[in-house]
Swiss-Prot record:
One of its GO terms (biological process) is dUDP biosynthetic process. InterPro entries: P-loop_NTPase (IPR027417), Thymidylate_kin-like_dom (IPR039430), Thymidylate_kin_CS (IPR018095), Thymidylate_kinase (IPR018094). It holds the Pfam family Thymidylate_kin. Coiled coil: none annotated. Belongs to the thymidylate kinase family. HAMAP family: Thymidylate_kinase. NCBIfam families: DTMP_kinase. It comes from the Bacteria. It catalyses: dTMP + ATP = dTDP + ADP. The gene is tmk. Its EC number is 2.7.4.9. One of its GO terms (cellular component) is cytosol. This is Thymidylate kinase. One of its GO terms (molecular function) is ATP binding. The lineage of its organism: Bacteria, Bacillati, Bacillota, Bacillota incertae sedis, Caldicellulosiruptorales.
Length: 206
């Protein structure tokens, strides 16, 4: 495909959303066509799935979560990601398959291999050119979430949950190619400088 597919992953509170906004601005200033999107929630159907998944009123089995996320991903890949990449856009996505592997495969106990199998149909269609994994110690990440007043289902999980997510992203960053792990404990600008360098390296290969 003509475009490039960049995915931001990481534990909650690591600053993904902030970095994605900075990357979007940076790339547009350099003349690139850019689409920013997210999973779940990058389509109208996905937005409804996101509300369901993050609503604290609903307690779900890990496999149920994984199947809902796969439904969201199918809509997203077909209606947003593939068209944008075919049109030559740089697509910057907040979460993709690695999040399913960590949250449902590892933390919820569905199993890494099961999540990989479930999502293999999407890997046959498109693959990210770069995974940027932002990791932040769960102690600091939880402080950030509290300061931001976040209160959805994931944000209100206990410390052990957030520790497992943090360790899960550390683990998957070693399992898959095209993953760059960036420690997110510095200032926003410090982290962005690291992010910018790996994105510049990718785009030089065009």
């Amino acid at each position: 495909m003509k475009g490039k597919f960049i995915v931001f992953e990481g534990n909650d509170g690591s600053g993904k959303s902030t970095q994605i906004l900075k990357v979007e601005k940076y790339l547009k200033e350099k003349g690139y066509k850019v689409v920013t999107t997210r999973e779940p929630g990058g389509t109208e159907v996905g937005f409804r799935i996101r509300k369901l998944l993050l609503d604290p009123a609903y307690k779900m089995d890990g496999l149920t979560e994984a199947l809902l996320l796969a439904a969201d991903r199918n809509e997203h890949v077909k209606n947003v990601l593939i068209p944008a990449l075919e049109d030559g856009y740089v697509v910057v996505c907040d979460r993709y398959i690695l999040s399913s592997i960590v949250y449902q495969g590892i933390v919820r106990g569905v199993g890494v291999e099961n999540i990989i199998k479930l999502n293999s149909i999407f890997e046959e269609k498109i693959k990210p050119d770069l995974y940027i994994i932002l990791t932040l110690s769960p102690e600091i990440a939880l402080q950030r979430l509290k300061m931001a007043g976040k209160n959805d289902k994931l944000d209100t999980e206990n410390f052990d949950f957030h520790r497992k997510v943090y360790n899960g992203f550390k683990e998957v960053s070693k399992m898959f190619k095209k993953c760059v792990n960036i420690e997110a404990e510095g200032t926003v600008e410090d982290v962005f400088e690291k992010v910018r360098k790996v994105i510049d390296d990718l785009l030089k290969k065009r």
